Each structure stands twice: as C-alpha cells, then as structure tokens.
Amino acid sequence: MNNKYEQRSKNSYNKKAENYDETFDGKFTVKFKEILYKAVDIKNNDIVVDIACGNGRLLQMLTKKNSFYGYGVDISEKMIEQAKKLNPSMNFYIGGCEEIPFKDSEIDVMTVCAAFHHFPNPQKFAEEAARVIKNGGDIYIAEVYLPAILRIICNPFVRFSKAGDVKFYSPNEIISIFENNGFVKNDIEFSGKVQLIKMKRK
C-alpha cells in the first residue's frame, strides 16, 4: 500500500474497529446504513458486495431482506476481523477499492456506505465497479452531502485529515464519474447530510 490516504484510513479504522459502533464515526454512519437498507433491491441468491464494508454491519442488516451471497472488502484488517465475527457465513477481503477481487461481470449488487470521500482515485474505482458488476446490476452509493459553499470551504483542507478523507463530492460529480464508465443514473435521494445515488450498469 503506497497511497497516503489509504494508509491514513487503514490506521484510523484499525484503532476504532473493536468498538466501532460506539465511536463517533460508527454512530454517524447509522443513518447511511438505514437509508441503504431501505433502498437496496436484493433478489434471492444475488451476489452482494459492500465496498469499504467496515465491521460488516450493513451486510448483516441486508440479510433481513432476502437470501444472498454476501462479500465485503475493506482496507482495515481489524475491521475485517469484526466483519467476519458478525457475518460468519460471508466472505471478506482486505484491500482497497481500486482492485476488487472478483471476476468480470460477477456481481449483482454493490454498496458503498459513507466511504466514497475516502477513495484516492474514484475514477479507478468506477472502472473496477464497471468490470465486476453484471450488465443490469446496481451500485448504491450513500455518501456525505455538503452544499456547494461547504464543499468549497472544506475540500482544500479535508485532504489533510488523519482519517484519510480525500474530497467531498456533489451528486453530479459522482454521477458523471460513473456515467463515463458504463453506468446510467437510476435515482438520487437526499436526507439531511446523506445523498444516495443509485446507478445501473448498462
């Protein structure tokens, strides 16, 4: 791992992994998970992958919706340890978002919960998502939403965060990245500081 943002994220989340749900970040992301839970459409036996899965809480929640094959990817090995404990029947991988350990056109549903602003190269992530998601498959991104003026103020400084934050995005920026990589916009929802972007693989 040679990216400073990835290293910062890994160090930060390794420290808080054991009690993540009780930390500020853990509590902050509850609403993101709840919004994703309501929005995600999972069919029986779908292959579902949560990128930057953390302790696997979202995947655990999604098991209430349908029977699926669950996978998670996260850069923090300590978070992956917790995810395996929480979801013993699922498979988890330590890694970043730019090399997703799946074959071409293998995934039905992909989720990203409050993590997109940590990705060092979102273009590369979108390319990988396009590679591994089936035609007609879906990606759901629940991300921090800041009004334009706050993005202008925060973005020059957020990259110095010890937690590995890189940039806060507008919904149009996120959509454009994925439209340039073979996705079409399905829907956008806003709820307070959460933007939920749903895209479909063409």
Language-model segments: what does each one mean?
Residues V49-I51, N55-E99:
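Class I SAM-dependent methyltransferase SAM/SAH-binding core
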Residues A114-A115:
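Short catalytic micro-motifs in class I SAM-dependent methyltransferases
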Residues K198-K202:
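C-terminal lobe and adjacent flexible extensions of AdoMet/dcAdoMet transferase-like proteins
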Residues M1-D41, R57-M61, M79-Q82, C154-F157, ...:
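Conserved class I S-adenosyl-L-methionine
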